[in-house]
């Protein structure tokens, strides 16, 4: 979370000078649900979501700030736990685990969206519904 804050602080003067910019922070559904791999993880992701909303208020209208909250994503985090990942699929509305490319596409979309700020967008195949 500190890294996100310091990165934003470093880039804001340049974005304000150009009167345009977008920041997209990556949190997690753990920051929304309070459940995750550990309590500190969930709390830190909740802080990321709070930072995102606070920055959106502070930096508008020149800079848009949004967040992405991925659920399960097929990354190396699952190494050694592939069976657990596969067992989750049945409980997901879309019956699939997101790929890193899915998250990247959402981030790119948020950067291009000029009418959106302060929102945390969940990408979790319906896991939190």
UniProtKB/Swiss-Prot annotation:
Name of the gene: yusR
Record-linked InterPro entries: NAD(P)-bd_dom_sf (IPR036291), Sc_DH/Rdtase_CS (IPR020904), SDR_fam (IPR002347)
Gene Ontology annotations of biological process type: fatty acid elongation
Example of a GO MF term: oxidoreductase activity, acting on the CH-OH group of donors, NAD or NADP as acceptor
Pfam family, one: adh_short_C2
Tree of life domain: Bacteria
Full protein name: Short-chain dehydrogenase/reductase homolog YusR
Organism: Bacillus subtilis (strain 168)
Gene3D superfamilies: NAD(P)-binding Rossmann-like Domain
Family (UniProt): Belongs to the short-chain dehydrogenases/reductases (SDR) family.
């Amino acid at each position: 979370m500190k890294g996100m804050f310091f990165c934003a602080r470093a880039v804001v003067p340049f974005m304000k000078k150009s009167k345009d910019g977008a920041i997209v922070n990556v949190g997690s559904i753990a920051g929304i649900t309070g459940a995750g791999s550990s309590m500190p993880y969930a709390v830190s992701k909740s802080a990321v979501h709070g930072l995102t909303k606070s920055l959106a208020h502070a930096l508008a209208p020149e800079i848009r700030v949004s967040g992405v909250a991925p659920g399960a994503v097929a990354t190396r985090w699952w190494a050694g736990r592939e069976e657990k990942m596969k067992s989750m699929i049945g409980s997901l509305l879309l019956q699939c685990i997101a790929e890193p490319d899915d998250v990247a596409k959402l981030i790119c979309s948020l950067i291009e969206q000029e009418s959106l700020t302060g929102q945390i967008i969940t990408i979790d195949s319906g896991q939190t519904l």
